[in-house]
C-alpha cells in the first residue's frame, strides 16, 4: 500500500509518501517561521492561509519526485489535535484527493504520528515501551503496548515543556522560535550562576507542571534588570542554561520513574522538544544506569512532518480503518481514546529511509 501523508496541524505544511513494502519514499516540509516571526508566535488565521497557499504545490512535488502519480492507494491527513483552521485545510485537501482518486482516506492523530516517528528509523524500538511526548502543546508520559494501545501515565497540569521554552525566550527577547534559541544560548551559559527548581519531582506521581518554572524565570529576569539593567548576552546564556537544566532534569526524573513503575526497559521520546540535544544526552546517561534504552527520531522528524502521518495512517489503513467523506477535525483529541490495532499489521519502514 502506498500512502500520501498530509500534516497541517499548526505552522508546518508537511507531505510524504510511504510504501508498506518499500518504506518512506520521500517527504517535503514547508515551515511558516518567517510568516509568524514578527508576531512572536503562531497566528492561526495566517497559518491557515499559508497552508492553503503551499499544500497542493507540495503534494504535486512529492508525487512527482517519488514517481507516485496515479499510484497512491490511500490518503492520510492530520485530523487533530491542533488549530482548527489549519486542520480543516489538510482534511479538505486530503479527502478531496481521496475522493477524486477513488481511494480510502483516514484522519490521523497528530500525537500518534509523533509517537510512531521513531519507528521510521533503521533500528526501531520494539513494543512495549514508555513514550515521552514533549512539544509546544503536549507533555505526556504514555505506556505503549501496541499501536493504538495507549495508557496515559502522566501529563502536564498546566504549560507544556515546549511552551515554557518559548515563553522563557520571550522574557529575554530572544528570536522566534524560542525553544531552539534557548538551547543555543544555554550552550554558552555558566553552570551554577542561577539555581532553578525542578517542579513536582519531590512528590510521587508522573504529572508535570511548568507554569511555576516559567514564573520563576520571569522573576529572575526582572530581578536582574532592576539591579543591573537589562540582561546582557552572557546573563541571558546563564539564565537559559539554568532554565534548560531544570526542564531537562524534570523530564529525565519522571521518565526514569515511569520506567521503574511500569517495568519497561525502553523509552522513546518524540515531539519538537525531543530534538533538544541536552535532553537526549541526559536521558541516555540516566537510563544506562538502570539498564534501559532510549530511542528517538532523527531531528527532521522531531518537528511536525508528513512522514509520521503517512506512516501512522498506513498502519491503520492496513488494519482496515478508514474514514467516510465527512470533514471531521478535532482540535482536542485524547490520545488514549484511539482504537488499538494488531502490531502484526505494522509494516517495515526501514527500506528506503536512509537513502533519502
From Swiss-Prot:
Tagged with keyword Translocase: no
Coiled coil regions, renumbered to chain: none
GO molecular function: iron ion binding; N(6)-L-threonylcarbamoyladenine synthase activity
Transmembrane segments: none
A GO term from the CC aspect: cytoplasm
Entry-linked PANTHER family: TRNA N6-ADENOSINE THREONYLCARBAMOYLTRANSFERASE, TRNA N6-ADENOSINE THREONYLCARBAMOYLTRANSFERASE, MITOCHONDRIAL
Known role: Required for the formation of a threonylcarbamoyl group on adenosine at position 37 (t(6)A37) in tRNAs that read codons beginning with adenine. Is involved in the transfer of the threonylcarbamoyl moiety of threonylcarbamoyl-AMP (TC-AMP) to the N6 group of A37, together with TsaE and TsaB. TsaD likely plays a direct catalytic role in this reaction.
HAMAP family: TsaD
Protein known as: tRNA N6-adenosine threonylcarbamoyltransferase
Origin organism lineage: Bacteria, Pseudomonadati, Pseudomonadota, Gammaproteobacteria, Cellvibrionales
Amino acid at each position: 500500500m502506498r500512502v500520501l501523508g498530509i500534516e497541517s496541524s499548526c505552522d508546518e505544511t508537511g507531505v510524504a509518501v510511504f510504501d508498506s513494502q518499500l518504506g518512506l519514499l520521500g517527504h517535503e516540509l514547508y515551515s511558516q517561521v518567517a510568516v509568524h516571526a514578527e508576531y512572536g508566535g503562531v497566528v492561526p488565521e495566517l497559518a491557515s492561509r499559508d497552508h492553503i497557499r503551499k499544500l497542493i504545490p507540495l503534494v504535486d512535488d512529492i508525487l512527482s519526485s517519488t514517481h507516485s502519480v496515479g499510484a497512491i492507494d490511500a490518503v492520510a491527513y492530520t485530523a487533530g489535535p491542533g488549530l482548527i483552521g489549519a486542520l480543516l485545510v489538510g482534511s479538505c485537501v486530503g479527502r478531496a484527493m481521496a475522493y477524486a482518486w477513488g481511494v480510502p482516506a483516514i484522519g490521523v492523530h497528530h500525537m500518534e504520528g509523533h509517537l510512531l516517528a521513531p519507528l521510521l528509523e533503521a533500528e526501531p524500538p520494539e513494543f512495549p515501551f514508555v513514550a515521552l511526548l514533549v512539544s509546544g502543546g503536549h507533555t505526556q508520559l504514555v505506556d505503549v503496548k501496541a499501536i493504538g494501545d495507549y495508557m496515559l501515565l502522566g501529563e502536564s497540569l498546566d504549560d507544556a515543556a515546549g511552551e515554557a521554552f518559548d515563553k522563557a525566550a520571550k522574557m529575554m527577547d530572544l528570536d522566534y522560535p524560542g525553544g531552539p534559541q534557548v538551547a543555543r544560548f544555554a550552550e554558552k551559559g555558566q553552570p551554577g550562576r542561577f539555581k532553578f527548581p525542578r517542579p513536582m519531582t519531590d512528590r510521587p506521581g508522573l504529572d508535570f507542571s511548568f507554569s511555576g518554572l516559567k514564573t520563576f524565570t520571569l522573576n529572575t529576569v526582572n530581578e536582574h534588570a532592576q539591579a543591573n539593567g537589562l540582561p546582557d548576552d552572557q546573563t541571558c546564556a546563564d539564565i537559559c542554561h539554568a532554565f534548560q537544566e531544570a526542564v531537562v532534569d524534570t523530564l529525565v526524573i519522571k521518565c526514569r520513574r515511569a520506567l521503574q513503575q511500569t517495568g519497561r526497559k525502553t523509552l522513546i521520546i518524540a515531539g519538537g522538544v525531543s530534538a533538544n540535544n541536552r535532553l537526549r544526552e541526559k536521558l541516555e546517561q540516566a537510563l544506562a544506569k538502570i539498564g534501559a534504552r532510549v530511542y528517538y527520531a532523527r531531528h527532521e522528524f522531531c518537528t511536525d512532518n508528513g512522514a509520521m502521518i503517512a506512516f501512522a495512517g498506513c498502519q491503520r489503513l492496513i488494519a482496515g480503518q478508514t474514514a467516510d467523506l465527512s470533514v471531521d477535525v478535532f482540535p482536542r483529541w485524547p490520545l488514549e481514546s484511539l482504537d488499538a490495532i494488531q502490531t502484526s499489521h505494522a509494516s517495515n519502514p526501514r527500506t528506503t529511509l536512509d537513502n533519502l
